Amino acid sequence: MYIKAALLIVVLFGVASQITSALYLKQADFDDPRMFTSSFGKRSAIESEPQAYPKSYRAIRIQRRSMDDLDDPRLMTMSFGKRMILPSLADLHRYTMYDKRGSDIDDPRYFLFSNRLTCRC
């Protein structure tokens, strides 16, 4: 009796998996050549929009960072990388000591020059 019930469960599972896999393969039609092109998912436009070139360029400065700059506690906060009014890492002294710890570091006002102590070691 238990053997018949086990066989019935196996057969029902096999039939159900065959039906669902056939439905899935029918839903995902792999014969469509548009799925294998580099423009799949992009908007198809006959006329491409002209590219707008800027009239003026803004020069940027790329600086190399030393390992001492990684001691900045701003790098460990959740607000790192967001746009805020803060001095850059190059403006901070190498041996800057912060007078507060904890959740105060997440406050952007904490990093203004009036709230820090500088050690001239």
Curated annotation (Swiss-Prot):
GO terms for biological process: determination of adult lifespan; neuropeptide signaling pathway; positive regulation of egg-laying behavior; response to caloric restriction; response to paraquat. Induction: Up-regulated when diet is restricted. The keyword Magnesium does not apply. The keyword Transcription does not apply. Disruption phenotype: Reduced lifespan when diet is restricted, and in the presence of the oxidative stress inducer paraquat. Increased pha-4 and cup-4 expression when diet is restricted. RNAi-mediated knockdown reduces lifespan and resistance to the oxidative stress inducer paraquat. RNAi-mediated knockdown in an eat-2 mutant background rescues lifespan, but lifespan remains greater than in wild-type. It comes from the Eukaryota. Residues 1-22 form the signal peptide. Keywords: Neuropeptide, Signal. May regulate lifespan in response to food availability and oxidative stress. This is Neuropeptide-like protein 7. The gene is nlp-7.
